[in-house]
């Protein structure tokens, strides 16, 4: 046996012979930890109010998911949010009202989790982008019935207000570049800002995104007479889109109470839908899925996914009981024309049907969950744009020329 090192003998003797000194050292370390904790006390009033609001809103008894999923590396999360327009990566835009209108329909001032809304007054606020910036305007002005195409866009997770507004302008640049008709872009801006606890935020924002389905359903109800409506959802925003379509078609989501204002659109198969990196279970749109009726009034669905997505690769941790696979990681299955995919965890190439087109952007954008990477680097994003605009004859995968 190797002889004990001379340098370790005093430490061993200390542990064996001086229990009181060991206790004193332990108490001293505990005091240091307590002191460092008290150094940050008390928190400011705003943080206290924010936590109280979260506690009150979390009193809902509805169950949506059971556990968060984690990123592969700390840098795998989306890029940091923008706190001011001075830090924005979007230059000032001059929007021609004859071509496009850009609106923010916001629920950020409301509770982030809820089970019902007042269909006569849901409490949403509206802003329109003008030559002088974002200006408050009446919500009814955004929902007027005219001949403009209406595109409802729901952003993803970890988006502060300014970041979401900038994202709407980025999307508008792609749309206006290719559009042949006037359109009105309505972004549903929901409470999804990054908080100090990112893992808990993922869990909570997954619930919040599902609650936004009530607002998407309400918007579709208000636009039921409108002749031309498209929807786009990114990441968690896709939950709100498919959930809203499901509710609008008469479907029920456990834990939600939704009162429809109409019987749905007058014309069947009228909505065009596109999802980018959808953070929802790949079988939710199947006949037995949670949003089974989402495609009842949809003429076509385009899904862009990434089989190399480092975030959605861990999507199974969002519910440790069902261990779901994200449609944004492996595409949707169980739908008409896709019944042959019996293994929900299979990630092989998917067939294209007359109603559903799915494209893997992994080879183009690599290991990322960035929305802007899909827009700028996925060769199929122009298929999404032309699908939303109803310009299917132009829907060919080509490289974008938009720059920032």
What are these regions (language model features)?
Residues 1-8:
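Short, intrinsically disordered terminal tails adjacent to the first/last structured region
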Residues 9-27:
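Bacterial N-terminal signal peptides that target proteins for export
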Residues 26-35:
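Bacterial N-terminal signal peptides
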Residues 38-40:
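Bacterial signal peptide processing site
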Residues 42-140, 144, 157-159, 165, ...:
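Lipolytic serine-hydrolase domain surface
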Residues 148-156:
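Short beta-strand element of the alpha/beta-hydrolase
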Residues 233, 237, 241:
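Gly/Ala-rich beta-loop-alpha elbow adjacent to hydrolase catalytic centers
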